[in-house]
Amino acid sequence: MAELHIIGQIIGATGFPQNSLFCKWGVHTGGAWRLLSGLREGQTQVDMPQTGDMAYWSHPIDLHYTTKGLQGWPKLHLQVWHQDSFGRCQLYGYGYIHVPSSPGQHRLQCVTWRPLGSWQDQLSEMFVGGGPQLRSPDLIYSGADRYRLHTVGMGTVELELCIILRHFDRYGVES
C-alpha cells in the first residue's frame, strides 16, 4: 500500500489575547487510511512567555499512514486553550489545516477562530470566564454546518511538517 509519513512539530502560537496557552491537536482521515505508528491526537504543554506574545511549544508530531487512495487526505485540527493562574482552562480558538500533499518540508500557519455567542454570553465571559464551545468537534474540519456559526478570528498557530510519500506510484495512487 501507499505510505505517508508526517514528521514535524507544532512550533507555537501568536496573536491571542493572553499568554499561558496550550494546544490540543488531532488528525482526521478518511476510511481508506490506516495509522501504522504515532499518536492520532495529543496536547502540548502550557507556555507562558515572559517577553513577546509568541507561545512556543515545539511539540513533536510523527505519524505513519498507509492508504489505498487519496480520498480523505489527513487534516490536522487544533484547539488553543488559555490556562489562568487558578488552573482554569478557557477555549481560545479552533482551527484546522490540510496536511500538504507534496513531499518536502512545509512551514504552515493555521488561523483560528472561536464561536462568538450572544451578547449575554459575551458579558458572562467577561466576568465569569468560559464562553461558547462547539458541541461536536467534527464541525472544526467538516464544513457542513460551520457556515451557520457566528465566529470571531483569533490568533495563528505555526507548524512545520515534513512529508514523505512512499509507493504512491507503485499502487496507482497519483498525488
UniProtKB/Swiss-Prot annotation:
UniProt protein name: B9 domain-containing protein 2
Residues of the C2 B9-type domain: 2-118
GO biological process: cilium assembly; establishment of planar polarity; establishment or maintenance of cell polarity; opsin transport
Domain of life: Eukaryota
Species for this entry: Danio rerio
Role description: Component of the tectonic-like complex, a complex localized at the transition zone of primary cilia and acting as a barrier that prevents diffusion of transmembrane proteins between the cilia and plasma membranes.
Keyword entries, A-Z: Cell projection, Cilium, Cilium biogenesis/degradation, Cytoplasm, Cytoskeleton
PANTHER family (alphabetical): B9 DOMAIN-CONTAINING, B9 DOMAIN-CONTAINING PROTEIN 2
Family listed: Belongs to the B9D family.
Compartment list: Cytoplasm, Cytoskeleton, Cilium basal body; Cytoplasm, Cytoskeleton, Cilium axoneme
InterPro entries: C2_B9-type_dom
One cellular-component annotation, GO: MKS complex
Subunit field text: Part of the tectonic-like complex (also named B9 complex).
Gene Ontology molecular functions: gamma-tubulin binding
